[in-house]
Each structure stands twice: as C-alpha cells, then as structure tokens.
Amino acid sequence: VTDSLKKALAAVEAALEKKAYDLVVLQVGHLSSIADFFIVATGRSDVQVQAISRGIEERMEREKERPTAIEGIKRGHWVVLDYNDVVIHVFFEPAREFYRLERNWTDAQEVALPEPYRSQVRDLTLRAIG
C-alpha cells in the first residue's frame, strides 16, 4: 500500500465518520500529474459538507499532513481539499449532480475499498455519468 493510498484511506475514514455518502475514490495518477487519487464525497446539506471537510482536515492534521489549499469551505457547496497526491472533493448533493465531476475521469480506475468503506461507495454500474 502506497503512502498516497494510506492518505486517501485516512480521508475516506474521516469523511465516513461525518456521515459522507456516495464516496468514490479514483486512481488518476496515470492520467494526470495533478494527483494520484481523487476522492469525491457527498453531504446532504452545506453544513454537513463543511463538517465533512473539517473532519477530513482534522484527521489529516493528526496524520501530519498539511493541505496545499482548501477552497469553498465557507459556502459549503463544493469544497476542495488539496493534499498534493490526494485531492478531495466534498459536494452538497445538488452541486455534485450539477457538476458531475466523475464524468471527466471516465478513464480513471475506481479503487475497490475494503469494508467497512465499501458499503458507502457508489456502485459504478448504477451510476449514470454520461
């Protein structure tokens, strides 16, 4: 397991602790120099999106990881937490449906997460990203 994947799993765990849902972890390192992994998660309100984002930030801080940038936390519709090799997108549900970020990364491989994470991960066969 790479350091990038460990970092991604820590972020996933933190997001789930704050009741994020519809999580997708995409391996994008072979497609882009931006990051190794993108994580996309959803919250049911702007307040929950903020709580998920802060939870991730706190967890990463405990792991001695510092963000390069955090954008959008004040509004809570689309928060981006950039940890260099792991970039996390936390969306308010309507914003995620509007932007459909995953459609830009159809060539990316979705990371099969172990339980207990898997039960909250979006099933690609049920997702319409067209």
Locations of regions flagged by a protein language model:
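Active-site phosphate-binding and catalytic loops of NTP-dependent enzymes
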Residues: 62-70
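P-loop NTPase catalytic core of nucleic-acid-dependent motor ATPases
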Residues: 33
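Long, contiguous binding/interaction regions
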Residues: 1-30, 47-51, 58, 71-72, ...
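Active-site beta-strand termini and strand-to-loop segments that position acidic
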Residues: 81-83
